[in-house]
Amino acid sequence: MVYTITCNPSLDYGVTVENFQMGHTNRTVTEQMNVGGKGINVSIVLKHLGIPTKILGFTAGFTGREIEKRIKEQEIEAEWIRLPQGDSRINVKLLSNEGTEINGQGPDISKKEVQELEEKLGILTKE
C-alpha cells in the first residue's frame, strides 16, 4: 500500500476558450471538472497502474465533499480530516492560445488538525 498526503486538494475546473480576450465576455468551447492536488494525482496514477494506494488529507466545505465523492467514485481509498471552516480550493485552468491557471488558496489548517494527521501517520509507521 502506498500512502499519499494531500494537504490542499482541489477541484480543477478546466475550460477551453477560443480567442480569449481579456476584459470581454468569452464563451467556453469545453469544460471539465477534475480532482487535483499532488498526492491525489499520484494516487490516481498508482491506481491506474494497479498499485494499492490510500490518500490521507484535509477537506473542507462543499468543495471538499465533492472531492471526497469523486475520489470514492474512482474507487481510491481515502481517509480525510474534515476541517470545520472554509472550503477546499477550486483551481481554474484556462486553455486558449496560452494556458493560464488561477489557483485557489484553500482553507486554513490548525495545529490541532496537523497533529491529527501526524497521529495517523504515526500509526502507519508502527504497522
PLM features: residue spans?
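Conserved N-terminal subdomain of the carbohydrate kinase-like
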Residues: 49-127
